[in-house]
Amino acid sequence: MDREHLRRIAHEDLGLPTTPYCFASSYEELEDGAKKVEYPCVVKPVMSSSGHGQSIVRSSENLLEAWNEAQHGRRAAAGHENECSRVIVEALAPLDYELTVLTISSCAGITTCEPIAQRQQDGDYRESWQPANIPESIRTNAKDIAKRAVEGLTDIAQEAGETGWGVYGVELFVLKDGSLLFNELSPRPHDTGMVTMISQHYSEFALHALAILGVPITSNYTELSLKNNEVAASHAIVIKAEGSVGFTNIAQALQSGENNRCNLRIFAKPSVHGHRRMAVSLATGLTQEEARENATRIAMSLKTTQTNA
């Protein structure tokens, strides 16, 4: 994602609430920006995803390390070691939790899915569950911010002769006082949205394809498929290795889902170098805690085999 372009559109053009932020093209500019937004702050490359290159900076003593991490973790860093990537430095929000609102732009206009709650680790998704157990006021505000963001981007796309149709993953911060901030936006299906493969009649991938093909996506398409007030959860299966990875004990893992609906999606990724998300487990439960426990149990029951590179 292009964080600079998106942040300027969201805050400066659309007036959406965000954390204080600055952009920097050099370490010296980063120093100035960090002083403006104040410590603690977060430093990210303007082009990256899944937490790559992101650092929380508590004091000026750690700022150079954060600059170097952003340069190393930026998109397309390999082969461009002598080039500097612009970074965003923003104030560290007094965060309570994060939400993703999958928002669909189609020929029928803008519609949203139920907000998705999540757990992050090192700036990357590890678990998500839907529907999020949140107050109605936060739910309404979250959907409103998401719609405003996607309406603005769709207008820009259409001014350029494109449709702008598809799924957008709008990321929001919920602060301890109950207020919401726009964080980021992915103009595509979102990793936390993989839970929709078990929670909705139409997954985020199906909605993306249908919208692009010109099908009018209304609220009927975004309804949950859960029954009896169930909750659905996903658990990212992240493997640390060097080489090719395979999975065994799959049947036993799926049987560990405590008689609830469950599923497992193994990605067709050829190898791992360091750590990589290689699969996702999906499960339902009568409560948020039960759904998360079931998805985690499936993930932990898997066994891996590795062939060194």
Protein language model annotation of sequence segments:
Residues 104-106, 173-175, 267:
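Short beta-strand micro-motifs enriched in acidic
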Residues 123-133, 184-197:
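Short, flexible active-site loops
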